């Protein structure tokens, strides 16, 4: 509305489920909940964050926010690979490299604080990571139609999952967290994938599609639906529908094997 009326916009996020309150990107959906398109409004003039309010917000939304923020570094680096970057997107990609580690280091403690509705340094660190750090990266790495390095295969998984039978039951960041593992699998970053897979399992984020009630028979529908998004339209030429489906299959197998091993250990 502020964009259409050409009015200044001030935002006051009450949850830390994503970076929307700092960015100029809005995701639009069809009435049935399936992904429709991305919309690019004007940036907010300022975003006011009260961590006391966010500490009292639903636990699941902070949990999903961690899953969403986990995607920022791997997607920005992956999407910009091989590109000659101008100053602003170059700065954005470099900034993305500070997004992952605070989540892995403080994420579990931040969730514990949220469960108890307490503001702690760990909670503040994670909230600012989810909302501010990833939001700034988003703004610096998006200039359609010139370039789009903001997100990639992890969000392709989410966009497509909205077309599955039960994908709508799950939160955005919950699905993106699994998409991160798919991207790292596709890119051959198996050590980092396994590290994040262990973290996901620690805090209850998914490591395979079974945990999202998505069957492998739906992977083709995911690949078809996601093609409406900027992530797919700005992908590298070597990423095909078939290779995307294959990386989802590979991660599903890896996640199942991980869960089986954890069950044997009693973890």
Residue ranges and their predicted role:
Residues 3-4, 40-41, 144-146, 230-231:
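Short hydrophobic "helix-edge" motifs at membrane interfaces and signal-peptide entry regions
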Residues 4-96:
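A glycine/threonine-rich phosphate-anchoring loop and its flanking beta-alpha core
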Residues 33, 52-56, 71-82, 101-112, ...:
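Generic secondary-structure signature for well-ordered alpha-helical cores
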Residues 86-198:
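Active-site segments that bind and position negatively charged phosphate/pyrophosphate groups
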């Amino acid at each position: 509305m502020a964009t259409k009326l050409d009015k200044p916009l001030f935002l006051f996020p009450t949850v830390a489920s994503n970076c929307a309150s700092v960015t100029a990107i809005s995701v639009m959906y069809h009435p049935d909940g399936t992904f429709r398109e991305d919309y690019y409004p004007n940036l907010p003039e300022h975003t006011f964050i009260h961590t006391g309010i966010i500490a009292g917000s639903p636990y699941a939304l902070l949990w999903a926010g961690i899953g969403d923020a986990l995607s920022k570094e791997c997607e920005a680096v992956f999407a910009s690979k091989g590109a000659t970057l101008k100053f602003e997107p170059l700065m954005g990609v470099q900034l993305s490299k500070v997004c992952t580690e605070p989540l892995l280091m403080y994420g579990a403690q931040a969730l514990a604080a949220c469960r108890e509705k307490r503001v702690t340094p760990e909670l503040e660190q994670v909230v600012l990571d989810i909302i501010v750090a990833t939001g700034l990266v988003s703004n610096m790495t998006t200039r359609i139609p010139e370039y789009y390095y903001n997100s990639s295969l992890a969000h392709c998984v989410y966009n497509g999952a909205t077309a599955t039978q039960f994908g709508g039951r799950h939160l955005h960041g919950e699905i993106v967290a699994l998409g991160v593992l798919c991207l790292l699998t596709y890119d051959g970053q198996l050590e980092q994938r396994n590290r994040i897979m262990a973290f996901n399992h620690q805090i209850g984020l998914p490591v395979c599609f079974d945990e999202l009630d998505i069957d492998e028979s739906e992977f083709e529908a995911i690949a078809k639906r996601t093609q409406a998004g900027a992530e797919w339209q700005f992908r590298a030429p070597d990423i095909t529908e078939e290779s995307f489906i294959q990386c989802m299959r590979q991660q599903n197998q890896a996640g199942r094997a991980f869960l089986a091993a954890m069950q044997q250990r009693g973890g």
